[in-house]
């Protein structure tokens, strides 16, 4: 219950920040922060090296493994903080903006905080005590959101999300340590470290490939179209992809740990995965429809015409958010079943596809080309990832075909109704509200018809189970 409530609150606060921040920050501010976070992400992957995944899976000698993992990650973090100066210098020269250097270095301090948070979080996941991990993490995120908004209103420009991120990490890490019985230890076993790196290296390579796929569009847009144009893309991506993706994160926050615990029981693994798939399909497409249909009302009615370049690419990216969620669910299942090499292959394939098609698409067609290239790449990779997960779990087309067919019918009907109603009104907050209500009404209504009245009943059961 606690995890679900916090996840919902976190999603709402994140959306609130995306409503407010464009009113006080410029596209250039968003672009600078997007690039800084991208380079910080590279450091974060190297510093983590899949250690959390290994800690959740390890069966014996956890205390020794945890101590070694902590020392290993702390040492890497210290080295990477020093390396962040060089990385920041490189970024500032590549993008011809000296303002990138210091934000990257400041964000890198968060690596130390993440080192101390890693083991307490893994301990909670191992015990399936998700609230012990979720409460500190969520409180930290809440603090980060409010700090970012307050700093933006106070005029801190692109520094607002930088300082907000560090504030959130500081609070979250402090609470994780305070609520955990585990305390940092400086024990280090070389043999254990080799085992961690052997498994974690594969996970890290997969994560790095996913990171390249996730941020190659940011890097390309910032380089070829400019940092300010990247700000438009950042907002479009936040609503088009992250909005629906946040829903999958609510499920994936717990699904990997649960699947890891039932990995030896194929029937239970299959059931857990199919349930997650059904719950996600019940809700995520509705969010995607809303963004695709109501992007003009959202951007022009809330942000104003200054942000209008974000509209079309936001609409193109709307389906990507749903696809990313399906890919995340499949990825968790494969990790839990001990098949990280499949994820490694698919992740690098995605990176290769996007690195190949995003630059020429962006150069030729601008932001629209970027969005279309990302949509194509993610579609191919999600299909492969879900296919591998289905094979590993023994799931046939017949198991998911009715769900997919009903979802497609519902999406088309609700999208058509929403477009018809919203097109009759000028772009405004009122049009956004009316359009949203129309889409939700038809979405729920069509699902009810297709399931003969079982959709809401099943949905309420899901919600009740999540909050019980």
Q: In which residue ranges do the predicted regions lie?
A:
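Signature of the first transmembrane helix
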Residues: 1-49, 77-88, 110, 140-149, ...
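Membrane-water interface segments that mark the loop-to-transmembrane alpha-helix transition
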Residues: 1-11, 36, 45-89, 102-108, ...
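Alpha-helical transmembrane segments of multi-pass membrane transport and lipid-handling proteins
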Residues: 15, 71-96, 102, 106, ...
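Helix-loop junctions and terminal segments of transmembrane helices
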Residues: 46-63, 125-126, 236, 240-284, ...
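Membrane-interface junctions at transmembrane-helix termini in multi-pass inner-membrane proteins
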Residues: 54-63, 112-136, 154-159, 180, ...
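Hydrophobic alpha-helical transmembrane segments
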Residues: 101-108, 136-181, 198-200, 206, ...
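Interhelical loop/hinge segments that connect adjacent transmembrane helices in multipass membrane
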Residues: 131, 174-214, 219, 254-271, ...
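Membrane-proximal transmembrane or re-entrant/amphipathic helices at the cytosolic face
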Residues: 395, 404, 418-468
């Amino acid at each position: 219950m606690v995890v679900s409530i916090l996840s919902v609150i976190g999603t709402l606060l994140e959306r609130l920040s995306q409503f407010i921040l464009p009113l006080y920050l410029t596209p250039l501010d968003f672009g600078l922060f997007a690039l800084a976070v991208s380079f910080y992400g590279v450091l974060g992957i190297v510093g983590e090296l899949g250690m959390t995944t290994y800690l959740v899976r390890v069966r014996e000698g956890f205390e020794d493994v945890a101590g070694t993992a902590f020392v290993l990650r702390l040492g890497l973090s210290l080295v990477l903080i020093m390396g962040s100066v060089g990385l920041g210098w490189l970024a500032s020269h590549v993008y011809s903006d000296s303002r990138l250097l210091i934000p990257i270095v400041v964000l890198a301090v968060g690596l130390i905080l993440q080192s101390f948070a890693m083991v307490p979080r893994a301990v909670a996941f191992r015990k399936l005590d998700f609230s012990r991990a979720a409460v500190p993490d969520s409180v930290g995120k809440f603090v980060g959101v409010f700090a970012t908004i307050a700093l933006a209103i106070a005029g801190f420009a692109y520094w607002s999300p930088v300082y907000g991120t560090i504030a959130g990490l500081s609070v979250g890490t402090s609470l994780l340590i305070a609520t955990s019985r585990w305390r940092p230890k400086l024990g280090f076993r070389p043999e254990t470290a080799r085992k961690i790196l052997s498994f974690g290296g594969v996970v890290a390579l997969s994560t790095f490939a996913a990171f390249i796929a996730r941020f190659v569009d940011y890097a390309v847009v910032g380089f070829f179209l400019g940092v300010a144009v990247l700000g438009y893309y950042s907002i479009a991506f936040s609503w088009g992809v992250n909005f629906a993706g946040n829903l999958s994160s609510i499920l994936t926050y717990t699904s990997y740990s649960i699947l890891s615990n039932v990995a030896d029981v194929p029937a239970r693994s299959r059931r857990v995965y199919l349930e997650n798939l059904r719950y996600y399909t019940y809700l995520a497409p509705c969010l995607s429809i809303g963004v695709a249909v109501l992007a003009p009302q959202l951007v022009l009615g809330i942000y104003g015409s200054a942000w209008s370049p974000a509209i079309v690419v936001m609409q193109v990216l709307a389906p990507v958010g749903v696809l990313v969620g399906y890919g995340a669910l499949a990825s968790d299942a494969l990790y839990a079943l001990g098949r990280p090499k499949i994820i490694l292959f698919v992740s690098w394939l995605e990176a290769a596809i996007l690195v190949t098609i995003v630059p020429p698409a962006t150069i030729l067609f601008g932001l629209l080309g970027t969005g279309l290239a990302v949509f194509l790449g993610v579609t191919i990779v999600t299909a492969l990832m879900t296919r591998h997960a289905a094979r590993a779990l023994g799931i046939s087309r017949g198991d998911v075909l009715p769900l997919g067919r009903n979802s497609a019918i519902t999406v088309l009907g609700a999208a058509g109704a929403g477009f018809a109603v919203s097109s009759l009104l000028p772009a405004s907050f009122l049009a956004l509200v009316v359009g949203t209500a129309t889409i939700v009404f038809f979405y729920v209504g069509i699902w009810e018809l297709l399931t003969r009245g079982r959709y809401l009943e099943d949905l309420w059961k899901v919600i009740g189970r999540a909050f019980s």
